[in-house]
Amino acid sequence: MAAPSLSTPFQPYVYQSPQAAVTAFQILGGEAQILQIMLKPQEKVLAKSGTMCYTSGSIQMENVLPPENGGGLWQWFFGKNVINTSFVNSGSQDGFIGLAAPSLSRILPIDLATFGGEIICQPDAYLCSLNDVTVTTTVNRRPRPGIFGGEGILRQKLVGRGLAFIAAGGSVVQKNLAQGEVLVVDAACLVAMSSTIDFHVKYGSSARRPVFGGDGLLTAHLTGPGIVFIQSLPFYRLSQRIARAVTSPNVRDNPRFFVQIGIFFFLAYIMIVSSLLLTDV
């Protein structure tokens, strides 16, 4: 495998695949990692489009629509990217490929065989997979009826006995839940979990939040047994910070500025109308 080469004396953190692994790989770097996979002749890796950084000369690329993605056409109609990229080593010698997530992420290797052949993850978490892995987007975890904001939670399932790689923002914590153990997580920080875990989501907000501010967390209540992966910096949270930094000072300092102005004028209107009515009387 090609060794990482830098012009500085600081070598990146390297996670080496276990010696018993069928396909050798390395995870390079710290906060924005690169996955480097060694491919034997005719060996293939399936990756999300737009994740390739570099390859050896023997690697051939092809855009494919996974046949198991039954809802792909419907997602494409609403602007979703449903095309994956297949990378095949067409040479007679070993080759390599470097993949990375489109945001600041750490990369987690997931051996599906150790998870009972199935894991559920956020739709943007999947990076690539090797061997026997099927990626579907038919899972749609919603909150109980009447709870607002539950769409889009853990809508992707990875099934098979192969090796998958998922990306998570910031630092990653793994929690092993015992039978009946409960864990409450911000839904945006939930990356992936075992399919054996039962959970529901709640929207913990109040009518005062749009006016006075505060967190309105969409929380996931998880009940074991199973394994949970939690990220410290979801891309949604990072994008909100960036958006606030590039907006005008009034909106940046108080995102609910326009709501408060609207309420002020509404109350002023009520006071004026009331004074006119009292004057007529």
Language model segments and positions:
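Composition-driven recognition of glycine/serine/threonine/acidic- and proline-rich low-complexity segments
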Residues: A2-V281
